[in-house]
């Protein structure tokens, strides 16, 4: 326990908060060929690999994922939400932050219904999260 005098001289140092989605906090200047500090809510990228992963211990499934090379030249693993998808290699996608708890190393989600990613077919509820248009009556 520090004394009052020690606290007056040094003070408390607050811990720096680490980002949950670091790839969204970096930009890339292609003229200078160096990284910049530009935060973004989403980023565009190109799929380099599309496949399935198996989740951690208590769960069992084949979760769809895509390896994405972002516009800032970083490569990340992103989860493809919803049932069925039309993504393949060289598809242009939009990613947002948000991890998948039972897939280690997956810190991003692909936004359905944006760029080359189609919305989920036949979805009636929670459509906005899956990029599905309103059904015709």
From Swiss-Prot:
Residues 1-43 are annotated as: Disordered. Keywords: Ribonucleoprotein, Ribosomal protein, RNA-binding, rRNA-binding, tRNA-binding. PROSITE patterns: RIBOSOMAL_S12. GO terms for biological process: translation. Transmembrane segments: none annotated. One of its GO terms (cellular component) is small ribosomal subunit. The keyword Ligase does not apply. SUPFAM superfamilies: Nucleic acid-binding proteins (SSF50249). InterPro entries: NA-bd_OB-fold (IPR012340), Ribosomal_uS12 (IPR006032), Ribosomal_uS12_bac (IPR005679). Pfam families: Ribosom_S12_S23. GO terms for molecular function: rRNA binding; structural constituent of ribosome; tRNA binding. CDD domains: Ribosomal_S12 (cd03368). Part of the 30S ribosomal subunit. Contacts proteins S8 and S17. May interact with IF1 in the 30S initiation complex. Belongs to the universal ribosomal protein uS12 family. NCBIfam families: rpsL_bact. With S4 and S5 plays an important role in translational accuracy. HAMAP family: Ribosomal_uS12_B. This is Small ribosomal subunit protein uS12.
């Amino acid at each position: 326990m520090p004394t009052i005098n020690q606290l007056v001289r040094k003070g408390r140092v607050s811990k720096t908060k680490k980002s949950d989605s670091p790839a969204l906090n970096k930009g890339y200047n292609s003229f200078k060929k160096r990284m910049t500090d530009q935060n973004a809510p989403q980023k565009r990228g190109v799929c380099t690999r599309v496949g399935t992963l198996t989740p951690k211990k208590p769960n069992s499934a084949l979760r769809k994922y895509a390896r994405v090379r972002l516009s800032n030249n970083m490569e990340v693993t992103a989860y493809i939400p919803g049932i069925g998808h039309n993504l393949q290699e060289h598809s242009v996608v939009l990613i947002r932050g948000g991890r998948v708890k039972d897939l280690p190393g997956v810190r991003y989600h692909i936004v359905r219904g944006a760029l080359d990613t189609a919305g989920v077919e036949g979805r009636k509820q929670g459509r906005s999260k899956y990029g599905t248009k309103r059904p015709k009556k």
